[in-house]
Curated annotation (Swiss-Prot):
This is Biotin synthase. Homodimer. It comes from the Bacteria. Keywords: 2Fe-2S, 4Fe-4S, Biotin biosynthesis, Iron, Iron-sulfur, Metal-binding, S-adenosyl-L-methionine, Transferase.
Length: 332
């Protein structure tokens, strides 16, 4: 005789989280394994937590790819890696003027955070100074928050970025420690954690998340959320694999739109006070249920990603307005 699974009271679990009672790994796995018919109840419960901490505000972030391709690392998901055969634009560093122009475009797109991203294993000191020159001008002429994602950092470089006024440093964990060797062989999971810690020690707010759909188990997905809690990432980008043609993960498809919603909800339950961002792969993986994702997440990228296209900013603004939510705009 088939055993009937007892339905969870997701709202009660959410109110427990609001009262600062942490959920267990078993609770997180239960969210991920819940029947698809429960997803709206789960998202409604996640919204209780999201609304308690962030109300109806949605943070917008814009990326500029300041150096594309030419990366010596062999990350299997990445179109910019040395082993990728993806037909992407490849170019060396943009000028400081172009980086500053991008900041003003971010404001036009109603973004509050401007993300300066460069491919590569780690920046040279000269490259860090190049970024710092642009950062200082952006800080003098706008009220944007600035995030940098430049690869591995040493302590001196992290300190210089902090001194220049960089608010946040992004360095994703990408996948579970157990799964890391199957994704990349040119650096380790611990290398990535080390850079997150160096940024934090320098006084920069750490931004770190993962790419879901790269062969990790359900249990590992839950453990990633708790690892991000452990390292105290202030901002958590949830990326969903875009299996780019020409990369080793080409054609891999593990996630349904409902799976993605469950990941976002689980991340909100585990990290209730943190900025949860629906990041790369949003349009491709969530498709028509993108708006529902914002009942758990409180942040998105506006415009294009590093090498893949996003939807038009007007579509994102409209989606947010249709939900009755509000853009947390940059103060001009």
């Amino acid at each position: 005789m088939k055993q009937v699974q007892t339905k969870r009271d997701w709202k009660k679990l959410a109110y427990d989280v609001v009262e600062e009672k942490m959920i267990t790994k078993e609770d997180a796995i239960a969210i991920l394994e819940a029947d698809d018919t429960e997803v709206l109840e789960i998202m409604n419960a996640a919204y209780i937590i999201r609304h308690h901490h962030f109300g109806k505000k949605v943070k917008l972030n814009m990326i500029i790819n300041t150096k594309s391709g030419l990366c010596p690392e062999d990350c299997g998901y990445c179109s910019q890696s040395i082993i990728s055969e993806a037909p992407i634009d490849k170019y060396a560093w943009l000028t400081q003027e172009k980086i500053v122009e991008g900041a003003h475009e971010a404001i036009r797109r109603k973004a509050g955070t401007y993300c300066i991203v460069a491919s590569g294993r780690r920046p040279t000191d000269k490259e860090v100074n190049h970024v710092i020159g642009a950062v200082k001008e952006i800080r003098e002429t706008t009220d944007l928050k600035i995030c940098c994602c430049l690869g591995f950092l040493n302590e001196d470089q992290a300190g210089l970025l902090a001194e220049a006024g960089v608010h946040r440093y992004n360095h994703n964990l990408n996948t579970h420690a157990n799964n890391y060797d199957s994704i990349c062989s040119t650096h380790t999971y611990d290398d990535r954690v080390d850079t997150v810690q160096k940024a934090k020690q320098a006084g920069i707010s750490p931004c770190s998340g993962a790419i879901f759909g790269m062969g990790e188990t359900i249990e590992e997905r839950a453990e990633i959320a708790f690892e991000l809690q452990r390292i105290d990432a202030d901002s958590i980008p949830c990326n969903f694999l875009v299996a780019v043609k020409g990369t080793p993960l080409e054609g891999q498809k593990e996630l349904t739109p409902v799976d993605c919603l469950k990941v976002l909800a689980m991340m909100r339950f585990v990290n209730p006070t943190k900025e949860i961002r629906i990041s790369g792969g949003r349009e491709i993986n969530l498709r028509s249920v993108q708006p529902i994702g914002l009942f758990a997440a409180n942040s998105i990228f506006v415009g294009d990603y590093l090498t893949t296209a996003g939807q038009e900013p007007t579509a994102d603004w409209g989606m947010i307005a249709d939900l009755g939510f509000e853009i947390e705009e940059c103060a001009l």
